[in-house]
C-alpha cells in the first residue's frame, strides 16, 4: 500500500517537473519576428542556399526569397534582425558558414550609414545582441559572441533567456507563434515581414544619380573597415554590398544618404562591389507614394518591384543561376511561392481597406492564408 502511495507521489512530482521544464522551454525566449526569421534559417536544408542576405530590417521588408525563386529559380534567405549592428556582422558571417555555403553573400549597409548626429547604431547594445544570440544554437561562435559583447553581470541570461523574459505575461501566448513552422519543418514565407500600409512620400527628394558624400562617425568607419578587413582575411570574394532603397524626405535623411555614398567609396577601396539603389530607383519604377509603408521600408508593392529587379541583377550580373535542388526541396519552395502569393493578396486587401497591421510568419497568419485563394 505504501509503495503504491509513494509511486503516485513520485509520478506527480515527475509530472510537475516535466510540466515546469516544458513551460520554461516554451517561454524562455522572446517570440517575435526576429526569432521566427532566424529559427527559419536553421530549418533550411544544409548547404542548400544559393544566396544569403545579411543586414537589418530593409533586408526582410524589401526582398522576398520565395518570389525571387519563383522568378529566377535560385534559393535565398535573409539572416537579418531589426537594427542589426555592424559589429555583429563578423559573428553572423561565421554563423551562416556553419550551416550554408552560399554562392553569394548580399550585405545591406544601412547600419554603417545610419549613424550620425551623436547616434551610432553600428555598435552593440543589449537589445540588438539578444535579438541575435537568443536565437542561436549553442556553439563556440555563440559563446565567443556573448563573451565579447555582453556584460558580466547578466551573462547567464544569454544562455538561459527565461531569466530575462519570464516576467512577460504575453510570452506564453506568443510561444505558439512558431507552432506551424515547427510542424512543417521549414519557413513558408522565408523570413519576410511587412506592414499593411501606404505612406505618402510628400516632399521626397529626387536623388537620381546624386553621388555627394558625408563623413561617417569615427566608430562607424572603424567598424566598417574592420569588417572589410575580416572579409579579405577570410578570402570572402563572394560578397556583394548593397544599399537598399530608402525615401529621403528631410535634410537629416539626406545626410544619411550622403553617408551611404561614403560607405560605397570605402567599400570600393577593398575591391568589393557596392550597389546603391537609393540613387538608381527609376530603373525599377519605384513609386514614393505607393511603394513604402514608411521612409525606411517598402511595402509589398515596392517589395515585389525590387525583388524582380534585384533578382535579375543577381542572375545576370553575378551568375546566380537556377538552383539544382532535390525534388523534395522543390516541393517546399513551390509551397513557399504559393503562400507568399496568398500573402500578397491578403496584405493587398488589408492595405487598400486601410486596415493597418504588422505582418510576419506566425501560426495565426498562416491559418488565415490557408483560406486565401492564390492570386
PLM regions with names:
Residues 1-8:
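N-terminal Lys/Arg-rich, disordered targeting/topogenic segments
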Residues 8-28:
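Hydrophobic membrane-insertion alpha-helices, especially the h-region
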Residues 29-49:
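Alpha-helical transmembrane signal-anchor/signal-peptide segments
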Residues 54, 58-144:
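Membrane-embedded segments
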Residues 63, 88-91, 150, 154, ...:
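Extracytoplasmic/secreted proteins, especially bacterial periplasmic and envelope-associated proteins
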Residues 104-116, 178-282:
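Conserved, well-ordered alpha-helix/loop/beta-strand core segments that scaffold catalytic motifs
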Residues 123-234, 323-375:
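Secreted/periplasmic serine-hydrolase-like ester/acetyl group-modifying domain
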Residues 252-365:
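C-terminal regions of proteins
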